[in-house]
A protein has these predicted regions:
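Short beta-strand segments
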Residues: 138-140
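Active-site-proximal alpha-helix that buttresses catalytic centers in soluble enzyme cores
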Residues: 2-24, 30, 34, 38-132, ...
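Short, well-structured beta-strand segments enriched in hydrophobic/aromatic residues
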Residues: 134-136
Length: 194
């Protein structure tokens, strides 16, 4: 028997072994892909609470702003129905950090500070770096509408960031992105809008 004939005879014996192995590897790769990409990302964007009038530049929160911010951690825990916040970002001013602090304390998170130049491209970084996670971003009247529009494609729906409104952008993969507005503040004033 020639050497080529022996090789041909050996190949059919490998097929019953290799074919199931390839099927298992392909299925495992598919499950891994689905597990890492087919998740829903939730980005909650809100403006810092009310700031004091003085000092100009980088003021602390006003007493009303402190009261509004104080309940944010519990409000988000209720809104997420016992879920968790995975990442927390805030602008690098005192008013943004003071608004984020109750959220950080409630969920045991560090506050990742965003310098002025870091807001550009933030939406795409949130989508790619935090897929399948829940992220809270505390911004400014000038940054919240743009970030929401970039995340949700809803440019006309958020003309300016309002006090006591959390913009919830739900990004399912696959599926259509949705935008919700939640009001927060004193007890009894929370409500959802679509």
């Amino acid at each position: 028997m020639s050497e080529a004939a022996v090789r041909v005879r050996r190949r059919p014996h490998l097929a019953p072994i290799l074919l199931p192995l390839l099927v298992v590897l392909a299925a495992g790769a598919g499950v891994f892909w689905l597990g890492t990409s087919a998740r829903t990302t939730v980005v909650i964007v809100l403006k810092h609470a009310e700031a004091a009038a003085e000092p100009r530049g980088d003021p602390d929160l006003s007493p009303a702003g402190e009261a509004r911010a104080a309940g944010l951690g519990d409000f988000l825990a209720d809104a997420l129905a016992g879920g968790k916040v995975d990442y927390l970002y805030a602008g690098d001013t005192r008013r943004a950090q003071q608004t984020a602090l109750p959220i950080a304390n409630r969920f045991g998170l560090p506050v990742n500070l965003l310098a002025p130049g870091e807001w550009e491209g933030l939406a795409s970084r949130l989508r790619s770096d935090h897929r399948g996670r829940t992220i809270v971003v505390v911004g400014y009247p000038s940054t919240v509408p743009n970030l929401v529009a970039q995340l949700a494609g809803e440019a006309g729906r958020v003309s300016e960031a309002a006090d006591g409104v959390a913009y919830v952008v739900v990004i399912p993969i696959p599926g259509s992105t949705r935008l919700f507005q939640l009001r927060y503040g004193p007890p009894g004033q929370a409500r959802a809008q679509r």
